[in-house]
């Protein structure tokens, strides 16, 4: 869950940094003598009105980021239970046995199960 939040935060920061660079480039292109070619301007194929709106509304994007992070944390909690169950079933299949939880009936007859005998610890160990 923390790694997901960290990834989203890094992604948001890098996106904000790249949008800030795009806003600076678009403002430099508006000024004469910017020295940028058309190839540089094609790197960001967003309309200039959208770039201006994104650059001017930093608080809205932060609110959206916080909402997205809260949704991601809620989604991570919900999806972690099935993933744990799947991993448990995978390892149970590898081991060939299943943990018996208290309060659940046991399939099969335990009287017919082979036993290894009773092992008693020497008195010095206890």
Curated annotation (Swiss-Prot):
One of its GO terms (biological process) is tachykinin receptor signaling pathway. It comes from Sus scrofa. The lineage of its organism: Eukaryota, Metazoa, Chordata, Craniata, Vertebrata. Residues 1-20 form the signal peptide. GO terms for cellular component: extracellular region. Residues 21-83, 99-126 form a propeptide. The keyword DNA repair does not apply. Transmembrane segments: none annotated. It holds the Pfam family Neurokinin_B. Residues 101-126 are annotated as: Disordered. This is Neurokinin-B. Belongs to the tachykinin family. The modification Methionine amide is found at residue 95. Tachykinins are active peptides which excite neurons, evoke behavioral responses, are potent vasodilators and secretagogues, and contract (directly or indirectly) many smooth muscles. Is a critical central regulator of gonadal function. Keywords: Amidation, Cleavage on pair of basic residues, Neuropeptide, Secreted, Signal. Coiled coil: none annotated. It is found in: Secreted.
């Amino acid at each position: 869950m923390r790694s997901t939040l960290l990834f989203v935060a890094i992604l948001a920061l890098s996106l904000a940094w790249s949008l800030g660079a795009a806003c600076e480039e678009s403002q430099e292109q508006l000024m004469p003598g910017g020295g940028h070619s058309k190839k540089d301007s094609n790197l960001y194929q967003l309309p200039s009105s959208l770039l201006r709106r994104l650059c001017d509304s930093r608080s809205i994007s932060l609110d959206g980021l916080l909402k997205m992070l809260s949704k991601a944390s809620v989604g991570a909690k919900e999806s972690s239970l099935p993933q744990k169950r799947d991993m448990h079933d995978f390892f149970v299949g590898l081991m060939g046995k299943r943990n018996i939880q208290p309060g659940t009936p046991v399939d099969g007859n335990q009287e017919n199960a082979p036993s290894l005998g009773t092992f008693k610890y020497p008195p010095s160990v206890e």
